[in-house]
Amino acid sequence: KQEIKIWGTITAASMVCGVISDRIDIIGIISIVILCLLYHTVNRINLILFIRVASGVLAIILSVMLAAHLIPGFNNWKVIDSVSLTETSLPYSMYLNMDKTLVGLAILGLGFPLIKSLKEWGSVLRSTLPIFLVGLIVLASASQAFGYTHWDFKFPDLFFVWALINLIFTCVSEEAFFRGFLQKNLFKIL
């Protein structure tokens, strides 16, 4: 499959870059390799169901532990350090979390692709964008009405760094795990 080669290559390249930049050590590599083996076992339809289910449960546990930064072997890079965007905002920090990112890349690299074509992108956007916009308006309005937030619109200098990191390092991983692995396998079981 073409998408497996692309995502598998991205996963391997990310791990190599992590080792070269001293962001991943041998324990981190071993944990990701084990995770890949577990994901691969879940996909093997010729194996006994018990082994596939046990591998899936272990993959979920290891994925959550990696995403929660409970497994050593990763030296995540702090790219934003205690920045306050306004006088009333709390300080904000952001990391490039390789452990969480590699969970998503491993899922995509082993055959759990989310979207395979531009046509599928269009379909997904048509079905989710209206829900997203309504949810955004309702939540923002409620938050404002109850006094949890106040409008202080600005376009901070770190927006593009924040958006890129959030998209690549957070959204891709979470979508791959929750939709590409968990939801897909629960759907198969049910």
Regions found by a protein language model. Give the residues of each.
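Juxtamembrane helix-loop-helix connectors linking adjacent transmembrane helices
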Residues: 73-170
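C-terminal ends of transmembrane helices
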Residues: 1, 38-46, 113-120, 178
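Alpha-helical transmembrane segments in multi-pass membrane proteins
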Residues: 3-107
